[in-house]
Design a protein with these regions (language model features):
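N-terminal, active-site-proximal structural segment of metallo-dependent hydrolase catalytic domains
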Residues: 1-84, 91-99, 163, 254-264
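Structured beta-strand-rich core segments of catalytic domains in phosphoester-bond hydrolases
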Residues: 2-5, 10, 64-143, 235-238
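Active-site beta-strand/loop signature of hydrolases that rely on acidic residues for catalysis
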Residues: 12-17, 47-72, 146-149, 165-193, ...
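Active-site beta-strand termini and strand-to-loop segments that position acidic
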Residues: 18, 115-118, 137-143, 226-227, ...
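Short, structured patches in soluble enzyme cores that scaffold and shape functional sites
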Residues: 127, 148-151
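Alpha-helical scaffold elements lining the catalytic groove of polysaccharide deacetylases
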Residues: 155-167
């Protein structure tokens, strides 16, 4: 018979703003500033894919993903990485259905994505009501809900978005992880009140910066967890395929319901 037991579910989460696999370095701004956003590199994408695969993550959050525009040669970068990992993927344009950006070439294919092993209950897309980047992806696993965000560049818009996010995660009946690129130019101090109000803490206890990738000075990329989640490892790997470094987090969900087979 099958007997329900309390156990710790161990998972590895990797979150990476890959900047559409456009690379880094001085050439990114030639022949004019920001020109690199118009050209993606399969070599960079393959490097990102190899790195992600080597970490053997259970869940991957990808930010600034090209979902198949002319820039990437019609390659859906989320699907490309997912296929290499043998993972399920869900992705969406980050601007919201009513945004004019949905009608612009290249831009309309800019999104965020989750990749996960096939033990997924469901995913939901939510949208902030302010800011340009509005997408929130909610990924519900058996024992935890994970929210992937890319917050606004403007401070005032970020604060509105954090208020919306607080109300959204309060509805979850499972332990919660909120992760992504928060664009917090003052680091953890900027989201301190949000974390306290939402009952979250940062997995990055030493406040290791993740941006810019070459010599990180700012903590932009976060993994925030609720009290039921135990962090067993956190790392910001020295990887330079993008202007951000990835964040890697191993965690246990304490008190998760597992099952075992007992023989009478």
């Amino acid at each position: 018979m099958c007997v329900a037991t309390l156990a710790s579910i161990r998972l590895r989460l990797l979150v990476y703003n890959i900047r559409y696999a456009t690379g880094i370095g001085p050439a990114f701004h030639l022949p004019f500033p920001g020109a690199g956003y118009l050209r993606s590199s399969r070599k960079v994408l393959d490097g990102i894919t190899s790195f992600v695969k080597a970490q053997d993550p259970d869940i991957v959050g990808l930010i600034e993903v090209d979902l198949g525009s002319v820039r990437s040669g019609m390659c859906n970068q989320a699907q490309h990485v997912a296929d290499a990992l043998g993972h399920y993927t869900t992705y969406e344009c980050k601007y919201g259905k009513s945004s004019i950006n949905n009608h612009m070439p290249i831009v309309r294919k800019q999104g965020n994505a989750f990749l996960a092993a096939p033990r997924v209950e469901g995913e939901r897309f939510h949208y902030f009501d302010t800011g340009i980047k509005r997408l929130i992806i909610e990924l519900e696993l058996d024992d935890v809900c994970i929210f992937l965000v890319h917050l606004a560049l403007k401070y005032r818009h970020r604060q509105y978005q954090l208020r919306y996010l607080h109300d959204l995660i309060a509805k979850s009946h499972k332990p919660v992880i909120v992760t992504g690129d928060f664009n917090t130019f003052w680091g953890t101090d900027e989201i301190y009140l949000f974390m306290r109000a939402a009952g979250l803490r940062s997995a990055n206890e030493k406040n290791v910066p993740s941006f810019p990738a070459r010599i990180p000075r700012i903590e932009l990329d976060f993994v925030l967890v609720s009290k039921e989640i135990e962090i067993t490892h956190f790392e910001v790997p020295d990887v330079r395929f993008s202007d951000h470094r990835p964040v890697l987090c191993d965690f246990n969900v304490r008190g998760a319901v597992a099952s075992r087979t007992a023989v009478a």
